[in-house]
Swiss-Prot record:
It is found in: Cell inner membrane. Keywords: Cell inner membrane, Cell membrane, Electron transport, Membrane, Translocase, Transmembrane, Transmembrane helix, Transport. Part of a membrane-bound complex that couples electron transfer with translocation of ions across the membrane. This is Ion-translocating oxidoreductase complex subunit E. Belongs to the NqrDE/RnfAE family. Its EC number is 7.-.-.-. Residues 1-17, 60-68, 114-123, 203-230 are cytoplasmic. The chain crosses the membrane at residues 18-38, 39-59, 69-89, 93-113, 124-144, 182-202. The complex is composed of six subunits: RnfA, RnfB, RnfC, RnfD, RnfE and RnfG. InterPro entries: NqrDE/RnfAE, RnfE. Pfam families: Rnf-Nqr. It is a multi-pass membrane protein. Residues 90-92, 145-181 are periplasmic.
Length: 230
């Protein structure tokens, strides 16, 4: 199995940062009330993950081990600031909607964890691929959870997509159900907790089904030779 395929499987499924490592739950639960918010924060996190992994991999031989964590945090904070300024300039409505959760990417355990566990020990290309697949895995969970919460809570999908993609994206809005009033449980953090629980349970069921279909390796019985004195 190639290294890229291994990194892809780890980031998207086997070691998914949200469903397996359970990292970054604060923004996952707070921001995923709509697909637009989830996708916006997911893209921002992905960009910071790739940028921080690449930068950490480039400077890993020049940073003393005693101060590596503060240096990594400074790198991540610089990248988050760049992403925040870009979002403020080109997606101001989404910037206001996400609020404090954009700068809080600095404290996201996924980013500092990948910088310390992988990027600081590998070359630039594997580090970039690791950041991309981990970020994409996080983004996919955000989008799936955001879709479920938006459909159940508001009966819509891609509501407010113009905040991220521009005026043309208003045509993407889909009204799945018509509600006289929103279902608040799905839109509030308790609904997000329930949704994450269902996603983790679904992944566990799928993993068990995959494991059951794989041929079991039978261990060869080892017989102990009995030695007797003749």
């Amino acid at each position: 199995m190639s290294e890229n395929r291994t990194l892809m499987l780890n980031g998207m499924w086997n070691n998914n940062p949200a469903l397996v490592q359970l990292l970054g739950l604060c923004p996952l639960l707070a921001v995923s009330s709509t697909v637009t918010n989830a996708l916006g924060l997911g893209i921002a996190t992905l960009l910071v993950l790739v940028g921080s992994n690449v930068t950490v991999s480039l400077v890993r031989d020049y940073v003393p081990k005693e101060v590596r964590i503060p240096v990594f945090v400074m790198i991540i904070a610089s990248l988050v600031t760049c992403v925040q300024l870009l979002m403020n300039a080109y997606a101001y409505g989404l910037y206001l909607s996400l609020g404090i959760f954009i700068p809080l990417i600095v404290t996201n355990c996924i980013i500092i964890g990948r910088a310390e566990a992988f990027a600081s020990k590998n070359d630039v290309l594997p580090a970039a691929l690791d950041g991309f697949w981990m970020g994409l895995g996080m983004t996919s969970v955000l989008v799936v959870l955001g879709s479920l919460r938006e459909i159940i809570g508001n009966g819509t999908l891609f509501d407010g997509a113009d905040l991220l993609l521009g005026e043309w994206a208003k045509v993407l809005r889909i009204e799945v159900f018509h509600f006289d009033s929103a279902f608040l449980l799905a839109l509030l953090p308790p609904g997000a907790f329930i949704g994450v629980g269902f996603l983790i349970a679904a992944k566990s069921v799928i993993d068990k089904q995959i494991a059951a279909r794989q041929p079991k390796q039978q261990k060869q019985a080892i017989e102990r030779a009995r030695v007797t004195n003749v």
